[in-house]
From Swiss-Prot:
EC number(s) given by UniProt: 2.7.7.72, 3.1.3.-, 3.1.4.-
Cofactor note: Magnesium is required for nucleotidyltransferase activity.
Catalytic reaction(s) noted: a tRNA precursor + 2 CTP + ATP = a tRNA with a 3' CCA end + 3 diphosphate; a tRNA with a 3' CCA end + 2 CTP + ATP = a tRNA with a 3' CCACCA end + 3 diphosphate
Species name: Acinetobacter baumannii (strain AYE)
Binding residues for CTP: 8, 11, 91, 137, 140
Pfam families assigned to the protein according to its UniProt record, in alphabetical order: HD, PolyA_pol, PolyA_pol_RNAbd
Binding site for ATP: 8, 11, 91, 137, 140
Classification via InterPro entries: CCA_bact (IPR012006), HD/PDEase_dom (IPR003607), HD_domain (IPR006674), NT_sf (IPR043519), PolA_pol_head_dom (IPR002646), PolyA_RNA-bd (IPR032828), tRNA_CCA-adding_enzyme (IPR050124)
Listed name of the protein: Multifunctional CCA protein
GO biological process: RNA repair; tRNA 3'-terminal CCA addition
GO molecular function, one term: ATP binding
NCBIfam families associated with the record: PRK10885.1
């Protein structure tokens, strides 16, 4: 039997990029051969084995044939007669269809090295269209390799468009869409993922709430970029630039969904867009089965981001209630994530990417103030329900003093 390193590890090796995961293809072996050598079977749909020592994945060379809709609509065939070329042709992109043997020799039957050199993302064969998940994968690769100048081949983008128009994307399970999207959100240029999906017509099928933002105007004095969709992607790029968490990036992505629901006669103003956004954010999260923690932050940012922008003018009681809703006493990290998302919104505007956002520090200091006030700070004779009431009173008074000090400093 012959063993070949394949896929992303070979691609990144040839690009000179670091890689961690290694996947191998085994040609000329049977499941019995693998078991006899101590490999552990793990594949449900086709023979995949874990190496007895390294625990790296070894898959028997296979071919596949479309047998139904969606990601699981395939029949696989594996046999000792299946060649390396047979296995590689079923892969998505030419740059992922390169193999390397144990001596370091490269096998590239479909021109992947040439496409790497020319910075092109190109599908290997028309079988690409049989797996709708590949539309999302190519969009994710476009995001990952955007800084290096990679572009999608026109014929591949056209094929993605055809797939989007065919309705095949509807067969994707929510779990698969979220898994691919959450990975894409953690790329350094996650905005390119969504722009690519829009370019091929997939965004309106998978994320209609986000697609609806494009073409919706905003007031140019606040948003020089004008377009709501462009602002959303610029804000997301700010979150990527700061290397923020998945929760923050997703919250930034959906913070303005309510603007797509603004009545035409009110444009370019977006009065009450925070409240209008609650329903589409909730629908999107439920449809994709977004994790609860991610959904909670997204809803908080959607509902409250304008309050963060206006934080220095908030009354102490209003600020306390905002901090309470963010669970400041039990989850200070959630307040920090909220602030990060709001700052991305403020900076995701044409020409304003580097402007200061003093509201962030103000919010952080306010958080520390309310968290520093403990039961031990109250008079000893306070009992029962009065304890909670007085704690709130003390915290609001402390926020009032903080606001006065801040105003005095800013006017001095």
């Amino acid at each position: 039997m012959q063993v070949y390193l394949v896929g992303g590890a070979v691609r990144d090796y040839l690009l000179g990029h670091p890689y961690q995961e290694k996947d191998y293809v085994v040609v000329g072996a049977t499941p019995e051969h693998m078991l006899a050598q101590g490999f552990q079977p793990v594949g449900k749909d086709f023979p995949v084995f874990l190496h007895p020592e390294t625990k790296e994945e070894y898959a028997l060379a296979r071919t596949e044939r479309k047998s139904g809709q969606g990601y699981h609509g395939f029949q696989f065939f594996t046999d000792t007669t299946v060649s390396l070329e047979d296995d590689l042709i079923r892969r998505d992109l030419t740059i992922n269809a390169i193999a390397m043997d144990q001596d370091g020799k490269i096998y590239d039957p479909y021109g992947g090295q040439n496409d790497l050199e020319n910075k092109i993302l190109r599908h290997v064969s028309e079988a690409f269209a049989e797996d709708p998940l590949r539309v999302l994968r190519v969009a994710r690769f476009a995001a990952r390799y955007f800084p290096y100048g990679f572009q999608i081949a026109p014929e591949t983008l056209q094929l993605m468009q055809t797939m989007a128009d065919s309705g095949e994307l509807d067969a994707l399970t929510p779990e698969r869409v979220w898994k691919e999207t959450s990975r894409a959100l953690m790329e350094n240029h996650a905005d390119i993922y969504f722009q690519t999906l829009r370019d091929c017509g997939a965004l309106k099928h998978l994320f209609p709430e986000i697609d609806a933002l494009f073409g919706v105007p905003q007031r140019p004095e606040y948003h020089p970029e004008v377009d709501c969709g462009i602002h959303t992607l610029m804000s997301l790029q700010q979150a990527c630039k700061s290397n923020y968490s998945l929760d923050v990036r997703f919250a930034v992505l959906v913070h303005d969904l309510g603007k797509a629901l603004t009545p035409a006669e009110e444009l370019p103003r977006h009065i009450m867009h925070e409240e209008r956004g609650i329903k589409p954010v909730t629908q999107l999260c439920e449809r994709l089965r977004v994790p609860t923690q991610t959904k909670q932050l997204a809803l908080s940012v959607c509902k409250e981001h304008l309050k963060c922008h206006q934080i220095m003018s908030l009354k102490p009681g209003t600020l306390w209630r905002l901090l309470q809703r963010l669970d400041v006493l039990r989850r200070p990290e959630r307040v920090e994530a909220f602030v990060q998302a709001c700052e991305c919104d403020a900076k995701g505007r044409l020409g304003l990417e580097d402007r200061p956002y003093p509201q962030a520090q103000y919010m952080r200091e306010a958080m520390q103030i309310v968290r520093s006030i403990k039961v031990q700070d109250l008079p000893e004779n306070i009992k029962g329900a009065e304890i909670g009431e007085m704690l709130i009173q003390y915290r609001i008074e402390a926020l009032a003093e903080f606001k006065n000090q801040h105003q005095s400093l800013s006017h001095s």
